[in-house]
Amino acid sequence: MKAISATELLRVLQFGDSTLPVGAFSFSNSLESALQAGEVHDANTLGQYVRAACRQTSGLDGVALLAAHRAACRQDLDGVLAADEALMLRRVGEEQQLMTTRMGKKLGELALRLCPAPLTGEWVKAINDNVTPGCFPVGMGLLFAGLELPERDAFAVHHYGLASMMVGAALRMMRVDHYDTQSILFAINGEVEDEYLRVAGFGLGDMAGFAPVFDVMVAHHVESHVRMFMN
């Protein structure tokens, strides 16, 4: 296996950083509803909820990300757009649709500023022309393909980003501390390789994310009264 260079490592770290300006801090991925409903109430239940969200995401966002990365490596815009559409059709929650499209467009615009690539430019134009939704995982796949970074790294960064977003939101809404949230992240990070191997052979037709409690919380989120920035 080719050793990753220091520059490649730093690229991976940069795009996995919570300070990446794509708006992730504005979302909780339904954690607000889970707190209101009592599904999450301490560090243990928080860890279980984040793990369930990450596992569901592997079979949906993760599959779309891998498909987009592979299509981008072939310079196949139609394949990228197909991954985008397939994911949007399966992300039925209002918050999740808003989250993935808002963050996706911002990531695409950032990618064009940092490391412009023709295919990324075509994807962003398709978003602006309302031809494609512009889902965040698809943008991540495009970005990493353009940087010639492997799909496994893109998958891991996306997986980490979701978990980091949720525990960051938890710190603002419930009684947990940084030791709790870092322990959760450490445990979930240890599972990402298995999650990648589980879905690496999936095609777009295999995308699935059966997690009924999580889906109910996503649907309930629109009416939730718990908010991250409540004062």
Curated annotation (Swiss-Prot):
Belongs to the UreF family. The keyword Chaperone applies. It comes from Laribacter hongkongensis (strain HLHK9). It holds the Pfam family UreF. It is found in: Cytoplasm. The keyword Cytoplasm applies. Keywords: Chaperone, Cytoplasm, Nickel insertion. Required for maturation of urease via the functional incorporation of the urease nickel metallocenter. One of its GO terms (cellular component) is cytoplasm. GO terms for molecular function: nickel cation binding. UreD, UreF and UreG form a complex that acts as a GTP-hydrolysis-dependent molecular chaperone, activating the urease apoprotein by helping to assemble the nickel containing metallocenter of UreC. The UreE protein probably delivers the nickel. It comes from the Bacteria. This is Urease accessory protein UreF. The lineage of its organism: Bacteria, Pseudomonadati, Pseudomonadota, Betaproteobacteria, Neisseriales.
